[in-house]
Each structure stands twice: as C-alpha cells, then as structure tokens.
C-alpha cells in the first residue's frame, strides 16, 4: 500500500531501508520512478508487488517499523475493479475490516517484538450516517495482538473535494469529516508477553 511513494522518498533521503508493497503495478511504477534520484547514503529500497495480507517474502520478526495509509474501504478506488486484491474495491465496511484484520495479523507477524506499526485511517459516511471506520480498524489491530500506544488526530486541510462536500453537507444537513487517526501500535517484546 505504497500509494504515491512519498514515504519511500523520505526513507531514502533519511538513510532508512524501506520495503514498499502494493497490489497495483501503477503505484509501484510511480514509486520506482520517484526513487530515481541520488543521495549520499546507503539506504536501500525494495519495491515489491504484493498483497499486504500475505507478505511471504518477509521473514517473521524482520521489520523494524511499519507505516501505512490503506484505503478507507471504497471511498477512493485505486483500481477500477481490475485488481482482485485491491482493498479499495470493497464497499461493505464489515467485509473491509475483515480483510484489514488479515493485514494486521500479517503486519504483526513481520514486525520485530517491541517495535511499532503506524496506520493512518479516516472515517466515512453511509446513507448520511457517520461510520467510525478508523475505530473498527483499530479494534482489528488490537485483536491481532497489537497494543495501542497513541491515537494522534490529524486535521485535514485543503482537501481536493472540500468545496463539493461543503455544498453537499449544507444541502443534506451533515458535518464534514475533517480529521484522520494516526494509530501507533506496538508489538509486545518477548520479555513482556
């Protein structure tokens, strides 16, 4: 779920090794192109087509830190149905969080004990009713074994579609969702289990 590749760029600049995964080849190619610059450090970037629910090429307890910003169900579709594994094609929220739980279990497997996993997640509306998608996802990460270290609220500014939604919210009598949650989870170290 590398998306546009900005995390990979920052990792390269900051001399961090990074493994970038996505099921969408266009996202991976965009990331590869964005990494075509020189830096004076020894950072390594690994860009792999892979479903986050099955990262078999990564060993147990191999990863030091996870940072991900998965789709919020089908709010934004990152492929138009042509990629079966694309989580952004799932409309039903319960089905979506069932699949995210599989991601959480796999992230727990690959993360080293005592290390952290950060996930940026927002909420949505269905039939004009607020859907706490972020909290449903948080619950699945907790169920997978993670502990919640922090819930950082990120305010959203200057979103591309804000004008459209301001008009729609006034017409339909609902408030805009102006925040996302950055959940920081920790995998217990083996001495604390």
For each feature predicted by the language model, list its residue ranges.
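Class I S-adenosyl-L-methionine-dependent methyltransferase catalytic core
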Residues: 1-193
